[in-house]
Each structure stands twice: as structure tokens, then as C-alpha cells.
UniProtKB/Swiss-Prot annotation:
This is Putative competence-damage inducible protein. Pfam families: CinA, CinA_KH, MoCF_biosynth. The gene is cinA. Belongs to the CinA family. InterPro entries: CinA, CinA-like_C, CinA_C, CinA_KH, Competence-induced_CinA, MoaB/Mog-like_dom_sf, MoaB/Mog_dom. It comes from Streptococcus thermophilus (strain ATCC BAA-491 / LMD-9). Signal peptide: none annotated.
Amino acid sequence: MKAELIAVGTEILTGQITNTNAQFLSEKLAELGIDVYFHTAVGDNENRLLSVLDQSSKRSDLVILCGGLGPTEDDLTKQTLAKFLGKELIFDEEASKKLDSFFATRPKHTRTPNNERQAQIVEGAVPLQNLTGLAVGGIITVEGVTYVVLPGPPSELKPMVNQELIPALTENHTTLYSRVLRFFGVGESQLVTIIKDLIVNQTDPTIAPYAKVGEVTLRLSTKASSQEEADRKLDVLEEQIRSTKTLDGKSLSDLIYGYGESNSLAYEVFYLLKKYGKTITAAESLTAGLFQASVADFPGASQVFKGGFVTYSMEEKAKMLGIPLSKLEEHGVVSHFTAEKMAEGARVKTDSDYGIALTGVAGPDALEGHQAGTVFIGIADRNQVRSIKVVIGGRSRSDVRYISTLYAFNLVRQALLQEDNSI
């Protein structure tokens, strides 16, 4: 099935509002296995909308119009669609009752004749009730093409799509199932290069890479009639990806840290800390509390996070973390020594299972002979202390700070997984 989205509204063309409905609808239709081929925006003009409908009816099986269902003169979507299909507009009984109820409870509101337009649908259409507004939607099939009209405000469109439109479209359609693999430690260009054969030869399932700040995701998608069928197909493809080696010989399996569109390294660490009953603290210099704030984002953070330190100056590192000032001056704040002592000091002072520390050069200027993006990350547990050095080149100050926290979370994640393997 080929689908097309038509956004109706001059305010979209003039840039007054962003057409977020297109993204939402495209994603929802993709989940149903319905392919969206065209996005169109047209102003509040009957002749231009008629022209767009004529074109759409010749190239698409499903045409969804968004916006223009309100009471004003420039809300002309239903009227124009009715004219295009050679049909009349009729009143939907349920939508009319909703109008009656709305104005009955608001005696100060004047019910002008144009308000009645919101309760109209194209003759022969199945109404799509508006759960959060007054303008009724509708769905109708004429000469093999299905037309849908939806309200423009996202607060009205989304509930109508989720609770009214999707059930109407799901009959006799396969569903698109997706699985998102999340990677840390490999760039998009290298990842695409090493799985090039899988991407070039893809049919079903498909692979779509997405680069995010500091990490990469792969969305694996397949059309199937059930979750079980989809899992079988996606499992095969995932195993092929996991068995691939990076250019320096690492297994991609070791670089996958989790699944899901909304997952994150921070959440994986939070989950593992709770799972193993461990606690963590942090001492931060260049990241200024960003690591700690990320942990605190999750409900129940107090179970795993005892508190932390933000120590920008050398003097505060010495005073708050118990590091001899002379040693800090000797080694410098941007060093393995300082990262390790910060991690150890924070862990001891809070009696936590893990201490993590970040110190380095956020930029744009160099510091102590180290280029911008040079970061040392220390990690301490009850038995040992160690640190890593990373260089995050060609990034803004905010990106350096954010990516530094990703490295820190990954370091903690690896430590927790090693502890699990030793049990």
C-alpha cells in the first residue's frame, strides 16, 4: 500500500508552525507496514488542494489529509474533499452531540453557525471521533483509494490516530516490526563500511543506520504477521551483525550496549547498579556534574547514587577529595594520576562501591599542554583503581563534555558486567 500525507494550512508554508504531524504519522504507518511515498504541504486554497488531490488519487492508495477541519472560512479540507469526490457533507450524530454538550456547559460562548462545520463528514465516510477536540475526522474509500481527514493540532490528531485510525487500518495488513541496536565505541562510517554487504543486499529485513552524538544505532525492520515471525527474522540478521569484526579486530557484539529507541548508556548503568545492589559516586571537573545529573534523571536514583563532587579548581580537588595539592601540582589536573585519585577519593568519602571521575580539557583552548578534547576518566572499586585516556577531537565544548560522560558510563558498565561474569 502506497500512502501519501497532505498537510493543509498556509501557516505551514509560511514557516509559522512545524509540521510534526508528518513525522508522527510516517512512524505510525511504518509500524503498520504501510509505506509512505509522498509528503505534501498545501495552503488554505480550494483550487490548489483540488489539484493536489487529483495528483494523489492517481499515485497513492491511502491519502491522509491533516488540518483544515475547524470552524473558520479557511478550514476547507472536508468541503474540498467532498467536492473532489462528488459527494455532500452530512452531520455526524455523535459529533453533533459533542458540540451540544460543549456549548451547554459554556453559556458564555456563542454558538455561531460556522461551529456546526466541525460536526460534518463526507457522505459515506466512517467518522473518526475526536477525543480531545470538536472537529470530527473521517475515512472513506472511493475507486480503490482510501481518504482520511484528521485535525491539525497534534493534541487532537495523535489520540485520533492511535485510537480511531490505526484500528481501522490494521485489518488485513502485515505489521512492520523493528529492533534498535545501540553501539558505543564505533563510528557510523566504520560501522556502515564493515556491514556494507548486509546493507547492499538487504531486502527484508532492512537495516537503517543512524548517527547520534557519541554513539550509533542500527534499526532492523521486517514485515511480519506476528511478533514471533518477526523475531525469527530479526534474530538471524542481528547474529550476522554481531559476528562482524571492526577494522581493528573487535567484535561488534562487544560494542552493542543495549536495545531500544529510548535506551541510553546512563540507563544501562542505572539498571545494572540496581540489579547488583551496587552504589556509585562521581567526582567531575570538565563535565561539571553532567554524569551525576544523568544518573539522577531516573526514578529511584537514590538507591544507587549516594552523592558526588564537582571540583573544577585544583584547590577544590585537594580540599574536597583529600588529594595532596603538591601531587596535583606535580602531575597536573589533566592526568591519569588526578583522574584516579579523584575517583578513589570520591568513593572512599561516600563509602560507595564505585567511584568515577572525569577531568580534562573541554576546550576550545588547550590546557597543560593537552589539546581540547583530551579527557582522563578514572574508576575505582573496593579493590582497585584505574583510568583511561580518550581524545574527542573536532567537537564543540558541549559535545566534548557529553561524550566524556558516555565514556564514563561505558567504563562503569563494563566493570559491572565483569563483576557479573566473576560471580
